[in-house]
Amino acid sequence: MHTVLYSNMKNMFQLLSFLCVSLLVAGDVHHHAACSTVCSLKGILDSVSDLTDLAKERLATLQNPICSKDKAFYMETYTNVTQNKAEKNGLPINCATVYQQGNRTSGIYMIWPLFLNHPISVFCDMETAGGGWTVIQRRGDFGQPIQNFYQTWESYKNGFGNLTKEFWLGNDIIFVLTNQDSVVLRVDLEDFEGGRRYAEAVEFLVRSEIELYKMSFKTYKGDAGDSLSQHNNMPFTTKDRDNDKWEKNCAEAYKGGWWYNACHHSNLNGMYLRGPHEESAVGVNWYQWRGHNYSLKVSEMKIRPIIFVPGEGLPK
């Protein structure tokens, strides 16, 4: 019985590993979710009451080659293919490599991230803290009309707005950008009185749509006050997709799309209300700096690889 059970588990893991590898080679943006599913099955199977100690030990030996060795091999293969494809077109994979190519002017550039089968336009910040930042969100006072951030799941998935003004780059793209490198998220904030603050989240990661664009990071630093940790390990919520911990929908209540908990200490995709506002927590809020009744003038969210050296670029 033990042998049959082990054989069945081995065959199942081999099948799932093949699926994972196929997605990697195809460049499917959900490949990380598929592989994490393979890995997480160990925990599920461990909970089965009739799983013997012998089967557990053998299953543990299977986990490493399937979820680490094989995945690493095919990830390296696919990465090399994609990099060669991008290099043939002269396109960098993010704004850090745009910087590495000698560009020092902030603006719109074309990049070709790994795991995407097409290039995209992004705004690169080449000035803040040494440059090399790929901007994923911006709020600001750009006059009329004001960009509406009270959007649907599909809109946040694909992105919206104007790269030279207010925009959300898109959860699918953010997923790709945060999975091709280990990155730091920087949030730059400004109020209407001229005050400025920043926050950084190290090892910032957004998972795939299958995992509801769950966000996580390891450590926080900055002078804005920590309004991110409450949202750590939370999935994304919009007015039409409620994934938060509140009995109601945080996005619907606070007029945005965000990694709401129950509900928020930051709401950078809230309503653009220009300073103090009466209705609590519906604006572009950063609670640990200006509270729930002050909507900020500027918010910029940007990412770059952790290994980037300010003023020097990426290690050669």
From Swiss-Prot:
Broad class of the protein's primary localization: secreted
Binding site for Ca(2+): 242
Keyword Calcium recorded: yes
Glycan-bearing residues: 80, 103, 162, 293
CC terms in the record's Gene Ontology section: fibrinogen complex
Subunit structure: Tetramer.
Gene Ontology terms describing biological process: cell-cell adhesion; fibrinolysis; positive regulation of heterotypic cell-cell adhesion
Site (Implicated in ligand binding): 254, 264, 281
Any one GO molecular-function label of the UniProt entry: protein-macromolecule adaptor activity
Positions in coiled-coil regions: none
Subcellular location(s) per record: Secreted
Disulfide-bonded cysteines: 95-124, 250-263
Name of a matching Pfam family: Fibrinogen_C
Gene3D superfamilies, per the entry: Gamma Fibrinogen, chain A, domain 1
Lineage of source species: Eukaryota, Metazoa, Ecdysozoa, Arthropoda, Chelicerata
Region forming the signal peptide: 1-27
Domain of life: Eukaryota
Protein name per the record: Techylectin-5B
Expressed in which tissues: Hemocytes.
Domain Fibrinogen C-terminal: 86-307
Entry keywords, A to Z: Calcium, Disulfide bond, Glycoprotein, Lectin, Metal-binding, Secreted, Signal
